[in-house]
Regions:
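Long, compositionally biased charged/polar accessory segments in the mid-to-C-terminal portions
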Residues: 154-179
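A structural signal for short, hydrophobic/glycine-enriched beta-strand patches
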Residues: 1-159
Length: 179
């Protein structure tokens, strides 16, 4: 039997508000959550049966500049973070912002092996961005895997044709940035 080991587990999220259309799924495990960050914190707490040991939330008037970091301690160290946007007057934080913020705040160093687990629909884009940011800039080896659609429960309705088209667009934009 093989075992996966990790020096840390990090939940990456955003400060995007939870939509009413998502409540039927999110209320099953995070009834009072208001952001993706809250959802990720509740998920980590439930899955790993842990409590926060420290939390820092940097609030600003512009929601796109807000960032948050929750620490859970233990081994492996568990962290949840939400990054601020690098262009807060234009947009909320994107995947690249989040990878850069994680690299900066968690002192990830260089040359690490990183496994990213995400929804299947997001694998191509997140892998490209991880290679571009974490691989090319910091020498990390990155592998991105996606869990099956059926694991998404009530959230599988967010995987419509429009969602796939948006992801295809994002993949093409990310590929262009690699050139």
């Amino acid at each position: 039997q093989q075992m996966i080991t990790a020096e840390s587990i990090v939940g990456l999220a955003g400060m995007r508000p939870i939509l009413d259309s998502e409540r039927s799924a999110t209320d099953t495990y995070a009834k009072n959550a208001s952001t993706e960050y809250d959802l990720m914190c509740r998920a980590m707490e439930q899955v790993f049966d842990i409590e926060q040991t420290q939390q820092v939330i940097e609030n600003t008037e512009n929601i796109n500049s807000v960032w948050a970091l929750a620490e859970y301690g233990g081994q492996p160290a568990i962290t949840v973070l939400a990054a601020p946007s690098t262009e807060p007057d234009k947009r909320r934080a994107n995947t690249a912002d989040t990878f850069l913020f994680w690299q900066d705040k968690k002192a990830a160093g260089t040359g690490k092996r990183i496994l990213i687990v995400t929804s299947q629909i997001y694998v191509p884009y997140q892998q490209l961005e991880a290679v571009r940011i974490l691989g090319m800039q910091y020498g990390h080896s990155v592998e991105t895997i996606g869990f099956p659609r059926e694991w998404s429960g009530n959230m599988s309705g967010l995987q419509t044709a429009a969602n796939y088209l948006q992801e295809i667009r994002s993949v093409l934009q990310s590929m262009k940035k690699l050139l």
